[in-house]
């Protein structure tokens, strides 16, 4: 039996969508769709207000970096947002859409299901419902800008922004400290339910920030929650841990943190081509006598090829390590329909691979984290379907005679995907241009399904197997 725990809520999703690359919507779309399919009722615990203290972040990151990153002067509206009212309007767009839906169906959501219409309201809720002020005064109020001052970027135009790479794809954005502490907490708080007598399966689709380094941000990642999770697991006396990364990009931050550890195995399956971020993760970077495993793939990888990679290389290497805990980074930027347009995995295919790995290690604690994915509507479908797969396979609450679980929403008769539409819910109109079809990116004949040339060959797999002595 497994205990299923997920960290998700309207609050968490709106905080997650402060991240610029989330386009004010990625996490909220996912949360709403998971709710539309009634999946949260299958979990033993749903964490709704995650939080990580400053000391938690310091278990991996340097003090100078954390002191700067979560300083209270950034827990406010930055000047670039104050001077651009369109940004706030865009941020509140989903709230307005949800309100219109609720009014249409005459539904009055409870307070915990109401969205925050401004980021300032979101932050006030954060202050009122956390112990941040009490336990972490230094990171909330240190160098706080007086409230009657106009927001200004003067504070951030200095050498430290360059030193910590807080520019380019990792800019300082409004309420950055709140974002870092909530989203990191969403991963770490899963461990509150760790027990030596029961297998834990924990999920945080807003986590998996695998590019962040000890002293700098990188690739949209500010705090490396994966590394912090592994450190916590080690403190809990779980010594042998495996990290598997299916993101399109190499999991460089996690790999570097544990590159000399004999107890921590890192496996990254990623695109490796000249000029592709982050430029690391070649086969030569791996160390056969250590636990650094890189599986560099080429353009066009599909379900069949990745399933072979998983069965012939990934699983045997995990078995060799015999982990007590397994962390899987479930990035979706390799899916058909993602803006990178590099791989052609399907939602069903990638989910099947992940579930098969989970089933192969019934005694290991398992943590599923999010990752890349730059088609927000596609990602909401992926994480909703994968969540359903996890509950279908592992939820204790689905066992026995429970009438509420009689119908599985993704069981399609005769394989006819064309008749399966997104369920009605508060954000369903976001899927209007895709005709509300759930599988539009995988349907034969769909204008959204664009097949790619697969440059990965059987000989490449043979080379990988030979390198890892399989």
UniProtKB/Swiss-Prot annotation:
Span list, region Histone deacetylase: 47-392
SUPFAM superfamilies: Arginase/deacetylase
This protein's record includes keyword Phosphoprotein: yes
GO biological process: heterochromatin formation; positive regulation of transcription by RNA polymerase II
Main location: nucleus
Name the record gives this protein: Histone deacetylase HOS1
Active site: 211
CDD domains: HDAC_Hos1
Anything else known: Present with 538 molecules/cell in log phase SD medium.
GO cellular component, one term: histone deacetylase complex
Residues where Phosphoserine is found: 110
Keywords noted in UniProt: Chromatin regulator, Hydrolase, Nucleus, Phosphoprotein, Repressor, Transcription, Transcription regulation
UniProt EC number: 3.5.1.98
Gene: HOS1
EC top class, as a word: hydrolase
Ranges in a coiled coil: none
Catalytic activity field: N(6)-acetyl-L-lysyl-[histone] + H2O = L-lysyl-[histone] + acetate
Similarity comment text for this entry: Belongs to the histone deacetylase family. HD type 1 subfamily.
InterPro entries assigned to the protein according to its UniProt record, in alphabetical order: HDAC_PDAC (IPR050284), His_deacetylse (IPR000286), His_deacetylse_dom (IPR023801), His_deacetylse_dom_sf (IPR037138), Ureohydrolase_dom_sf (IPR023696)
Organism the protein comes from: Saccharomyces cerevisiae (strain ATCC 204508 / S288c) (Baker's yeast)
Annotated signal peptide: none
Cell compartment(s), UniProt: Nucleus
Function: Responsible for the deacetylation of lysine residues on the N-terminal part of the core histones (H2A, H2B, H3 and H4). Histone deacetylation plays an important role in transcriptional regulation, cell cycle progression and developmental events. Histone deacetylases act via the formation of large multiprotein complexes.
Gene3D superfamilies: Histone deacetylase domain
